[in-house]
Structures are given as structure tokens and as C-alpha cells.
Amino acid sequence: MVDKIERIKELVEILNKYSYDYYVLDNPSVSDKDYDKEYDELKLLEKETGFVLPYSPTLRIGDVVLQGFNKYTHKGKLWSLDKAQSLDEIKDWHNRNIKFVNEMRAQGEDLPDLKYIATKKFDGLTVNLTYNKGGMLEVSATRGNGEIGENVTSQVKTIKSIPLKLQENDDLFEVHGEAIMTQEAFEKYNASADIPLKNLRNGAAGALRNLNIKETARRDLSAFFYDVGYKEGYQFKTYLEMMDFIKEKGLPIDEYLKVCTSIDDIKKEIEYIEKIRFDLNYDIDGLVIAIDDIRTRELLGYTVKYPKWAIAYKFEAQEATTKLLDVEWNVGRSGRIGPTAILEPVELAGVTVKRATLNNMDDIKRKGVRIGADVFVRRSNDVIPEIMGTLENTLENSEEICPPTECPACGSHVVLNGAHYFCENTLSCKPQLVKTIVHYASRDAMNIAGFSEKTAEQLFEKLNIKSISDLYKLKKEDLINLEKFGEKKSENLLNAIEKSKDCKLYSFIYALGIPNVGVKTAKDIVNKFKSIDGLKNATFEELVSVQDVGDIVAQDVIEFFKEEKVINTIDELLNLGVNPIFDEVKIVESIFKDKTVVTTGTLQNYSRTEIKTKLESLGAKVSGSVSKKTDYVIAGESAGSKLTKAEELGVKIISEEEFEKMLGRES
């Protein structure tokens, strides 16, 4: 028993070191296979002995669903920052600082010349971590009102870059940071999500405010830390010294820390960050400029709301205010009934916005949204606009938004499942069936050319097509009398339907519309199980062993294939001649095998999809962003910030011509 406990302690130390190397230093020190082997050994030993260290990596993802959030009082206040939206406002602030320093010097204070540190302003959710004298992560909390936040320790523990125990620590301290969702994590989550996330910020905020810890873990959040709000013992002399302390403790920081000594320096940094912001793998909404010298900060002090020694330069907002005219309830493919806001038209980021997203009734209540009131609308990175909140002074004479009592499409009974309402009529509810057929026919699914939602609606209304299998029973005489369907169009559609019978297995699995199974997940599970029967009979343990398949997806797959209606539909499709084929991907032995490759710019001989497919056939991992883990960057014409970052990190850069020569040397 003693030997096993010693081995547990050893494994925890080793695995935490691996995580630090991978997530903080961006420099993996072990293969995924070796990490998984030692992680599995640790899980087994913990189960056998019942001994689990409070900073064990196995505690990062639990089966816990919490009952609610407890309040936490911060030891040091988390202040908001005053905001500037023009360089003139920054100049005014700078001039006030100069005047103050000169006045203090006249009174005998030995203050240094003003030096500012510019950092990115992350657009996520602020978190405050408390580490005790032993270095243990004691509490993690949201900002709240700056003095009292909500305890989200279990949620924050899922962020793999955050150490659960520091190697060395003598003094209790609180450290402030921002929990964020990267673009990569966002795309990966949405590829298999039944309800896709709208933007990165909501992805992060929603994860930390989710009581289901496994769902939080699925979001795969990251974090950056930038401030020590409270510390016992030694106090810092400068902000740069503080940042060195944060880094030395093993907490992730952003390497962008620019020293500015003049307005011209600040202007250059603003221009630089504005130029690269949309090439970053995460969202930022501005630049923070803060005085470096701590004594100067102490003397400057605070207003009621803000520290006087820092200011945030905010990029042009993509928000506007308008009136909520109505709420429309729409039925999706899964039967989920979702609210859409009907707005008084408003110009936002160069587009006239008339509709916006409202996620569910919980979201409506939390934001205090009411019909007739004015609402804040945000449009981020060309996604569907979303309502962010309500102007309280416009609530008079507004109307409460009521949830649906019946399906708005078919009038059937609705049920509340979690935060969402669902129509139970899966047999004849038009939007459900139409969208199911449209999804089945879509390009990434069965790729039935010329098939549209309008076509699906006509098939439902005029020909009583209510199942995907009914598509293969259509005849020319059925189609020819439909609106805008002549002989030629009817023949083309029938040929496309016939052609779809010979399909790839992963396309067929994706076409079936399994909840939370996107194209990538369909490919991954097909590569594991290789046939429909293999997937039908897959166990929970077998499913979660597939890369990127978690408990929720695994359970969704199992429940899907339990439904008699699903099995009958699949059997009918196969009897009608649908022939899903599994093509084993043959990885060519290549210099690119197991290498991480990023492409940037325009290539002459490959589209984006073609180069990705080519690299994957060579065994490469294709990434959308450059990091220290990147092995090669293939640079085409008009290569942008990815090329610049690769040069800064010393990543091997090759041209398209060099790429093909490397392949030629291998053949």
C-alpha cells in the first residue's frame, strides 16, 4: 500500500510537469501515448487505494453536477478600468500623470520617469485565483461586483494550463486573469455540438457558469494571468516584477508586454494590436496601458470605480442599442424550439440588423429582456447578432416574454429539457422533418446536388415525404408537377439522389443527424468502428476511447442507436440501395508524419481543402494557428501574420515548391 501511495505522488508530480511543459511553456516533453499511459496508471492506483491528492490531474474533470454557486469575498478588490476610445483621451490621461509625478517630486517623492506597460485586453471572463502558503489552489472565483464573486473552483480546475499546486510558494496571494476560449477550441466544440456556441466570449463565460463540470471541460478553456491583487509578505516594486513572479509560479501569461515611454510608443502598439487582432487565436477587445512603478500607482490611487494608474484603449465597438419588437419561436432539426429576437432595424458594423439570437428562456431572464424595451445588440466576427442585455430605464410598459406552451409549427405538446423547450412530435412536425431531410442531403452529408430547403418543403407538403428514406422512392412523375420543377430538373434531382447511394461511411453517419456528432467526430468514430454494425454495438468505454469523444457525445451515440425508429430507417435505407463504404485512410510514410503543419497564404496547386487532405494523408496534424509546437509553416502568396509569428518563433518555413520537392525526394 505504501509503495502504491508513493507511486501516486510520483505520477502526480510527473503528469503536472508534463502539463506545465505543454500548456504553459508550449513545449511538449512527452508523447500523447506516454502521457495517457501514466495517466491511466494513476487513475487505476487512485481507485485501488482510495488515495487522491488534492492537486491530482484526475480531479480536473469530475462527474460532478453542482447544485449552485456559493459567494466568495475577494481579499483584494478587482477594479474595472477606465476606458478610452481615442488617442486624444490617452494623451489627456498621460498629461495628468506627468503633472501628478511632477507635483509629487516637488513634495519630495523620488518617483521615476513615467514608464507604461502595454498588454492585450482579453475578451473572456475574469477569474481570481487564491493560492495558499503551501502553494495549493484554494479558491477560484468570478469577478462579480469586484468585492464579492461566485466560487467556480471546480470549473476553473478543468483549465489544464492552471496549476493546481505551485512548486514553491511562501505567501498567500490572489492572482487575476482572464479565462478565454481559443478559436481552435471553439471550432472543435462546435463541430460536434448540437447547439453551437455563438462566440468565444460566451463560450468561456458559459463554461465557467455551468454547473455540469464535464460540460465545462468540453469547452477546453485557456487562461492568461496579468495581476496580483493581494499578496502577503514581500511587495513588488514594479509591474514587470509582478509579471515575472506570475510567470515563475508557473501560471500562463501572454508574452506580449511592451514598454512605452511616450504617446508615440503607445500609438505604435495600438496600431500593431489593431492590425493583428483578427489573426489571433482568441478574442481581444483592446489594449491595457498601465504605469509600471508601484509607488507611483499607490500615490495616484483610485476613483470610486477605477484605478488612476491604468486605462483601457477600447477598439471600435460592434454593439448598438435598438428596440425589441417581438420574439419569434422556431423549431430546429432536433425539435428544439428556440427564440429569435425581432428588432427595430439598426446599423451595426456596416450591416442592417433586424434579428438577433436569444438562446433560451434562462438567457432571456438573466438578461432581463422584455418586448418593447431597448436592448444592447452585439455583432462579433460576422456571427449572428446577439442580444447582450437591456436598458433598465426603458422597461416601463414593456411586456414579459412567455415560453411556448405548444409547438409553433404543429401545435403539439412541448416539453422542457434542461434549458430548452422541445416539440415531441417527431413524426409530422414540418420544420423538424424538413430540416432533417435538408441536413441529410447537405454537401458534407449525402451531397445531393440541387437539393434545397424549398425543395424539402415542397416534398413534405405536396408529396408527403416525411422520412429521409422516402427520398429514394421518388419518381419523375411525382416531381414534374412541383413548382419550378420541369422534366430536366426532375431528372437531375433523381440522378443526384441515385448517385448519393454510393457514399462514404462517415458522410452517412453524419447525415443521420446524431446529436453532437459533426463531420470530424463522424470521421473519428468511423475510423474506430469501421462499419454501421460496429458503431451500433459500440460500448460507452469504446466510444470515449476515441480522440475528442467525451462522455456526452458517447452517450448521445448510444441513445441514438437504441431508438427503434432510427434502426428501422437505417435498415430501409440499406434495402433501398444506400451503400456506405469505409475507406481505410492509408498514411503514407513521410517526413511530415506526426508533424504539426500550418498553411498560410494562397497556394498555386492546392485549395485549402486539398492541402489539408494531402497533409493528413501524409500523417501530418494540420493546425490553424502557429505556436512553438508547429513543425512547419507552408507559406504561399500574400502570407499574413502566421508567417510573421513563425519567423518570430523560429519555426521552419517552406514554400509550396519546397514542400513538393520534399515529397519528391521521398518517392
Curated annotation (Swiss-Prot):
Tell me which InterPro entries the record gives: BRCT_dom, BRCT_dom_sf, DisA/LigA_HHH, DNA_ligase, DNAligase_adenylation, DNAligase_N, Hlx-hairpin-Hlx_DNA-bd_motif, NA-bd_OB-fold
Q: Report the cofactors.
A: Mg(2+); Mn(2+)
Q: Name one Pfam family in it.
A: DNA_ligase_OB
The source's superkingdom equals Bacteria
Q: Which reaction does it catalyse?
A: NAD(+) + (deoxyribonucleotide)n-3'-hydroxyl + 5'-phospho-(deoxyribonucleotide)m = (deoxyribonucleotide)n+m + AMP + beta-nicotinamide D-nucleotide
Name the residues that bind Zn(2+).
C407, C410, C423, C429
Cite the binding residues for NAD(+): D32, K33, D34, Y35, D36, S80, L81, R143, E178, K314
Q: Which GO terms describe its cellular component?
A: cytosol
The yes or no answer to whether the keyword DNA repair is present is yes
The top EC class is ligase
Metal-binding among keywords: yes
Q: Which UniProt keywords apply?
A: DNA damage, DNA repair, DNA replication, Ligase, Magnesium, Manganese, Metal-binding, NAD, Zinc
Residue positions of the active site = K121
| A biological process term (GO) from this entry | DNA repair
| Residues covered by the BRCT domain | 587-667
Which EC number(s) are documented for this chain?
6.5.1.2
A GO MF term: metal ion binding
Its family? Belongs to the NAD-dependent DNA ligase family. LigA subfamily.
Instruction: State the NCBIfam families in the record.
Output: dnlj, PRK07956.1
Q: What does this protein do?
A: DNA ligase that catalyzes the formation of phosphodiester linkages between 5'-phosphoryl and 3'-hydroxyl groups in double-stranded DNA using NAD as a coenzyme and as the energy source for the reaction. It is essential for DNA replication and repair of damaged DNA.
Q: What is this protein called?
A: DNA ligase
